[in-house]
């Protein structure tokens, strides 16, 4: 099983169509070889597209778009908790080869991991009766998130141009921005710097180390609760956090 998440968490990056096609072509070719082998199981692609409805512009590409032959080996996961800003509503869906979906349903029924029935019915009715409104909501949310992302990234570029030890990576979708704060390297532990930002600056971020990264300095900042109403306040908070970090680190005795 090969797993891909696009747009990705925490970076918000969308997989390049040519790269995705290359992966799909290899999977198809591998399965053609396995078809002639006794007791050989297929190689599947698990494609997590939970942030797809929040991708900016035309960046998002599903494996089917670039390699129709992958259909027999593709398992796609999606849901509404991200696109509707309803992270507490864990209702999603999977589509893929019939035998695989059947096995997944059996396992879920045994461990009792179904989404609450009331929420399933509510979502089904909502999509049936309010599909146009849902699409309008998505258009509004994507435009809002893209605008906010550009503004936040612009603030980090401004700070970077002034010589502060920061960097960023502009997202292509989702609700997160990747930021780099070199100041963390002056702290004994990443957690110490996070505590400083929360307690002294009012800024909460998540280090990439929590996602398995070995590189110290990169963090994920969420824009899920940012709107045009509080954007200026958030930008000031970011600037003050960076300036306080700079002052503190420069005053440290090594």
Protein language model annotation of sequence segments:
Residues 1-58, 249:
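Active-site phosphate-binding strand-loop segment of PLP-dependent enzymes
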Residues 24, 186-187, 196-205, 211-254:
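PLP-dependent enzyme catalytic core of the Aspartate aminotransferase-like
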Residues 25-42, 66-69, 131-133, 157-164, ...:
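Alpha-helix termini
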Residues 53, 62, 66-104, 115-119, ...:
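Active-site PLP attachment segment
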Residues 93-95, 121-130:
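Helix-loop "lid/cap" segments that line or gate small-molecule binding pockets
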Residues 104-111, 129-153, 186-187:
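Structural signature of PLP-dependent enzymes
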Residues 120, 124, 138-153, 165-181, ...:
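Conserved glycine-rich beta-strand-loop-beta hairpin in the small C-terminal domain of fold type I
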